[in-house]
Amino acid sequence: MSKQLKDLKVVFMGTPEFSVPILESLIELTDVVLVVSQPDKEVGRKRVLTPSPVKACAVSHGIEVFTPKKLREEYEYILNKKPDIIITAAYGQIVPKQMLIYPDYGCINVHGSLLPKYRGASPIQSAIMNGDEKTGITLMYMEEGLDTGNIIHAKEIDIAPTDTYGTLSEKLSILGRDLLVKTLPVIFEGENFDIPQNDDEATHTVKIKREDERLDFNKTAKELHNFVRALNPTPLANILVNGEEWKVLETEVGESTTDKPGTVVAVNKDSFEVACKDSTLVIKRIKPAGKKEMNVKDFFNGFNKDSLKGVILNEE
């Protein structure tokens, strides 16, 4: 049976670190004939053109990589590989209908939530932002609707209070890999798991844009604490301090306050506290403009921390 599965021609589509363990398991189990990923991006202050984690993984294994700017215009190259199955995990573009109907074993997506909850582009971030205590992975057959296809398998996982987008993404990636490894041989043998989603229970997420990353101190401290976790390690939440943008990496919820939201109400040895809707947000780790990320305690070694007291953040 394993020999037959090793002959299964797979096209894998994915982009971020989340997708890498899934690709690596497919390389071991099947014949990955092509990897499709997003085009290389300029990274850092020097704007160095950098491949996605998935592309880097595929190249290291000697597997051909295809990085179309517009998949809907270039999909025929993929179909020319004659895949038996297409598997996607956080790829980043809509897969056209012509691809969905081609493979004998269908198109399967590894999605970072318990569908139908959190369909769309940011399921992992959304679960943290909303303060959820549980989330999971869903394997589903793809169709034209966004994350609307029938469910093959799903598994739940706890969200730790300290989880960030980075740590939870890593846990879900391993869970997705293990679920796919367990399920793929059964799909290959022809068993059918089709469980329709209940559209009445569906919730939707959107791609997080640059303008969405600023902390809004009119919200509760708990909401902002979860927001910081959800955007760490990328793209990172930010604040404006006397016209300078600082990234915020680590926070906790402080004491209740009636001060104006956005006001720095306390400056401590290793943190500073900002008034929110109900209580303070204690900011403990930052990345000031033009500097590396650091604990606030270390930042204060070369900064007049008393000058922060009373500053109203996010004022242009």
Feature-to-residue mapping (PLM):
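N-terminal beta-loop-helix "entrance" segment that forms/cooperates
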Residues: 41-59
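A residue-level signal for conserved active-site and pocket-lining positions in enzyme catalytic cores
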Residues: 14, 35, 58, 86, ...
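Donor/substrate-binding cores of folate-linked one-carbon enzymes
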Residues: 7, 28, 85-204, 211
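Short amphipathic alpha-helix with an adjacent loop that forms part of the alpha/beta core around
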Residues: 72-82, 101
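An anion-binding loop in the catalytic cleft
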Residues: 2, 217-316
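Acyl-group handling in specialized metabolite and lipid biosynthesis
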Residues: 206-218
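N-terminal Rossmann-like dinucleotide-binding module
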Residues: 2-46
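Glycine-rich, highly charged phosphate/nucleotide-binding loops
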Residues: 64-74
